[in-house]
Amino acid sequence: MTRKQATIAVRSGLNDDEQYGCVVPPIHLSSTYNFTGFNEPRAHDYSRRGNPTRDVVQRALAELEGGAGAVLTNTGMSAIHLVTTVFLKPGDLLVAPHDCYGGSYRLFDSLAKRGCYRVLFVDQGDEQALRAALAEKPKLVLVESPSNPLLRVVDIAKICHLAREVGAVSVVDNTFLSPALQNPLALGADLVLHSCTKYLNGHSDVVAGVVIAKDPDVVTELAWWANNIGVTGGAFDSYLLLRGLRTLVPRMELAQRNAQAIVKYLQTQPLVKKLYHPSLPENQGHEIAARQQKGFGAMLSFELDGDEQTLRRFLGGLSLFTLAESLGGVESLISHAATMTHAGMAPEARAAAGISETLLRISTGIEDGEDLIADLENGFRAANKG
């Protein structure tokens, strides 16, 4: 029987404990495991290489994304770095979105400057620019859809097909939607990665990442390198992640519903100069999103019509929205891209990506939607007092 996403998320790892019959899998905190005899190791020998708790959550994540296997890492950034370590060598080209997450941009840019590989940042929604970049014969193509922070949507299937034509490996960062709303492997990607810190865990108490591959041989190679460079995830984080994963689908449904109400509210506000959400017909890639996603997601961003003082007054008027980086938790967060999530990008790079100095990003939580809108109303009231 093919299981639905909600069932996979809830049931993963349940009733697997044969020793005591625990319904919920236990946390295996041991760093090392004894051998049964000389040259007779067990399934696990050292927790950096393998851990029973990590095994359970890796199987769950692989099943949710439809992959052959998954490798859990200690951060989302280490998941990205793991992929580039495996697939790129000095001289190889990486093609990445020009408006990608600021941490990814900083990593690629800094390692390219050290000669680890070459990187080309391109607007992947511009087919001419994308084809020109692919003509340079990249080894790896990273796709981020929807993008961070402008929620631009690109055609994953098309980009992965074009990448395959030039012999490139395609990897999709699916952090913004989670497997509950989008499955890149089914759209043709070779790999999918997540910052598990975000929606997969959903409670802002874990830092972790994951890479999931279609090919079991690639999973084996990723796991070997993750152990080799020491970026595998820990047992306690694995346990918390598995616990959070069980409520992924209902959390996404409620957060998405709140986001849609907030988008509708923001459309009525004179201080909102631009609004970005895939549900909006004017949003770049709206029609693609309607086709390749199972929902429009709970992330949105908007530009305030004003200056830094307007921003300060607006943010100061909020009490429910927490001013913080990250996203995907049950609580609603708001962040200022230029000084927070994308501070690692040079001002000219932010400008080229369309990230303005008054852009705010919202990660919608699962609080009461009317309370969230009332809080935004307080923010706009404060902003207008200047």
Curated annotation (Swiss-Prot):
Record-stated family: Belongs to the trans-sulfuration enzymes family.
Describe activity versus pH. Optimum pH is 7.8 for the gamma-replacement reaction.
Q: Where in the cell is it found?
A: Cytoplasm
Q: Which cofactor does it need?
A: pyridoxal 5'-phosphate
The reactions it catalyses are: O-succinyl-L-homoserine + L-cysteine = L,L-cystathionine + succinate + H(+)
Q: How is the cofactor bound?
A: Binds 1 pyridoxal phosphate per subunit.
SUPFAM superfamilies, per this entry? PLP-dependent transferases
> Where are the N6-(pyridoxal phosphate)lysine residues found in this chain?
198
Name the species this protein comes from. Answer: Escherichia coli (strain K12)
Instruction: From the UniProt record, give the pathway where this protein acts.
Output: Amino-acid biosynthesis; L-methionine biosynthesis via de novo pathway; L-cystathionine from O-succinyl-L-homoserine: step 1/1
One GO cellular component, as annotated: cytoplasm
What gene, per UniProt, encodes this protein?
Answer: metB
List, alphabetically, the Pfam families matched: Cys_Met_Meta_PP
Which molecular-function annotations from GO does this UniProt entry contain? cystathionine gamma-lyase activity; cystathionine gamma-synthase activity; pyridoxal phosphate binding
**UniProt subunit comment:** Homotetramer.
Role according to the record: Catalyzes the formation of L-cystathionine from O-succinyl-L-homoserine (OSHS) and L-cysteine, via a gamma-replacement reaction. In the absence of thiol, catalyzes gamma-elimination to form 2-oxobutanoate, succinate and ammonia.
- This one is known as Cystathionine gamma-synthase
Task: Show which residues constitute the signal peptide.
Answer: none
Main location group:
cytoplasm
Write out the entry's keywords from A to Z.
Amino-acid biosynthesis, Cytoplasm, Methionine biosynthesis, Pyridoxal phosphate, Transferase
